[in-house]
């Protein structure tokens, strides 16, 4: 990773981080703030790091949420290119794509709902007890209600799987 990051810096090109290609204890989310200090823009290939076969479809997991929080906390929504992985040999590709994109959108929404200004203030005050308390409280914040409202306002059905199955039966089955 260090070679590729150094090379992109040397050549003045946008670095790409693929969170599916790091050691299991190494997190891309930990690298974002440092990369943003030295790069005008960065690119992320968000995937699910499964270290066998396929099944890389992005889900609303801890690392995806942490990546989104780093982007939002660094006020870098306009500086980070986000791509998702939807390769999976065992499930419908359309469903995998929609699920992955929605998971990233949910993670960004979750990050945008965090009380970042309050957390920064507490950090500056060395009030780590309240930081921990607030972070724990936010884990159960009603993101589902906000997500449902977002889908409704965008006129997007919450249940995309019905449409995917219909497409699968009417279109995809004819391709076999």
Description of each model-found segment:
Residues 1:
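Basic- and aromatic-lined ligand-binding clefts that recognize polyanionic substrates
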Residues 5-17, 23-176:
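Histidine-acidic metal/acid-base catalytic patches
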